[in-house]
Amino acid sequence: MNRSFVSIVIVQIASLFGDAVLRFALPLYVLNVTGSAALMGAVSAAAWLPYLVLTPIGGVAADRVNKRRIMAALDTLLALTCAAFLALDGTVDLVGLCICALIVLYAAQSVYQPTVQAAVPFVAPREGIVRATAIVSQISALSGLVGPVIGGLVFGLFGIEPVVAVAGAAFAVSAVLIVCVVRIPFQRAERSQGVLRMVAGDIAESFAFLRGERPVILKTILLVAGINLTLSAFIIIGAPVTVTQILGLPNQFMGFAEGALALGGLTGGILVGVLAKRLTLRQAPVFLFVAAVALLPIAVVLGAPLDPLVAYGVLVASLFVCMACATMFSIQGISFIQLETPAHLVGKVIALAMSLANCAQPVGQLVYGGLFDALRGNLVPVALGTAAAALVIAALTNRVLKRGLTAEGTAVDAVEVSESGALPVAVEPSEAVELPVAVESVQARMR
């Protein structure tokens, strides 16, 4: 790989590290200070809204605006946001301050990551684009693994201020490197219409294709939104509440739990690559079934009088399995979209798929935040109800795929795995990346 690509990789590492640390620490800080799962859910949900709105616009901007300037401006904005947080912490409302910081963070990343992805073809040789894209994607996954672990350790030992300071320094270093080192060729594109009108046209064209020619894809995306409403939101809100409040463990343990989620995502991606020739799209719902069943041990943790460390081990194992299975389903789903969508629509359809699949995430976080507060003394029904809902959605997905693939006569059976992403099942406060089954930093995948 050439020097230009290496320089982009270095600045991406710095920026995504700061992003992952903050996405983990700020909602947990709200939970620690207020003790309210509902407030933590509200903070996380509010932060998601600009991400959902700006992601399609970010894709258009990445194609039409100087990519180097976008990256430098966003990292500078994030560094200044961290500085403002440190200056205002303790003097203004905590929840409002965290919401503002996370909104800026999510909004920036909705534009930053598409810009990095769009820069790859300009700085990597044609024969190395697939490899370069895979490297960029793996850096994102690794940041979700390392960031929460380090963030949890620093937050648990020293509090929120050093965490924000470290993240701000990472953003500042990234901005300086972009200005001094990164070089991305840029040719100004002619624009016949405004960005918003262009985005609206892309969405309309993509939706018309899905509804008219590939309804099986549209139905599957909506079912993934259901998974994000239930299973993903349960994990995002339930994991930190369970670890820090119900089990009474230090914040460092929550960092390791988030690391387990990220490791599950990496493991799922590796397994799909290894088993690619044996997996078919018709088998994909099996992974959703397994993810749903993996919630049952969490019900035991919430209801049985187990030793905290034993309960923590069961919880971490369950989170790992959930994320691995969600990622495997996501990768198969996004590969199916790539194969079944005309080349000129692929990017637009994937962007629409990610927005639709993630749109239920904020609603789920609000609902589960309220449930964990209202039913703090008896959370077993919440876990069992979530598992039951996920099993029903998995069964519906199985039915939709079997009927849809047969009815539409698609030639896709064994799905060739793409190295560039997955359909987001969102499981992360750190991030979503595939057909998003969201287990957002607890990692955003269908993602």
Name what the model sees in each region:
Residues S7-R23, A47-V60, N66-L78, L97-G156, ...:
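Substrate-agnostic recognition of the 12-TM MFS/MFS-like secondary transporter fold
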Residues L22-A25, Y29, T34-G41, A134, ...:
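Small-residue hotspots at the loop-to-helix junctions and early N-terminal turns
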Residues F24-A25, F158-A165, A208-L271:
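A single, central transmembrane helix in multi-pass transporters
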Residues V53, I57, I70, A84, ...:
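C-terminal transmembrane bundle of multi-pass solute transporters/carriers
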Residues V95-Y106, G128-A189, G259, G313, ...:
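Hydrophobic alpha-helical transmembrane segments
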